[in-house]
Amino acid sequence: MAKEVAGQIKLQIKGGAANPSPPVGPALGSKGINIMEFCKQFNAKTQDKAGKILPVVITYYADKSFDFVVKTPPVAIQLLEATKKKSGSAQPNRAKIAEITWDQVKAIAEDKLVDLNCFTVESAMRMVAGTARSMGITVKGTFPGNN
């Protein structure tokens, strides 16, 4: 028989660096989840992505057990890594901070496709390009899908 789901918690944690301090401890402790057990499992699962911010969805059950799913890093974080910047533009319509190519956009879109609400790489590329524009990052050239 399936366990009864009590709820879900969504967090963004650096890979391989989960510890009981905030924000992880209070979020899990208030639901009665074993914090140290989650930290050990999360750190073991994300050793290869150490230092990257990773969204995680924790599903906890009535018997205080839990499961979690680690997703790919947010598009904004991947764009900042691609441009080697620390943050986006405060005025994205006026002050552009960097440029990226459609090849870089495609690489990010292919990586993120499993987590996005779309089915094709082209639509994922449009989503990534929109995020880039809202951060003050210019995408060089024309969209490769336009012939």
From Swiss-Prot:
It holds the Pfam family Ribosomal_L11_N. One of its GO terms (cellular component) is cytosolic large ribosomal subunit. One of its GO terms (biological process) is translation. Keywords: Methylation, Ribonucleoprotein, Ribosomal protein, RNA-binding, rRNA-binding. Belongs to the universal ribosomal protein uL11 family. Part of the ribosomal stalk of the 50S ribosomal subunit. Interacts with L10 and the large rRNA to form the base of the stalk. L10 forms an elongated spine to which L12 dimers bind in a sequential fashion forming a multimeric L10(L12)X complex. Forms part of the ribosomal stalk which helps the ribosome interact with GTP-bound translation factors. PANTHER family: 60S RIBOSOMAL PROTEIN L12, LARGE RIBOSOMAL SUBUNIT PROTEIN UL11M. This is Large ribosomal subunit protein uL11. It comes from Parabacteroides distasonis (strain ATCC 8503 / DSM 20701 / CIP 104284 / JCM 5825 / NCTC 11152).
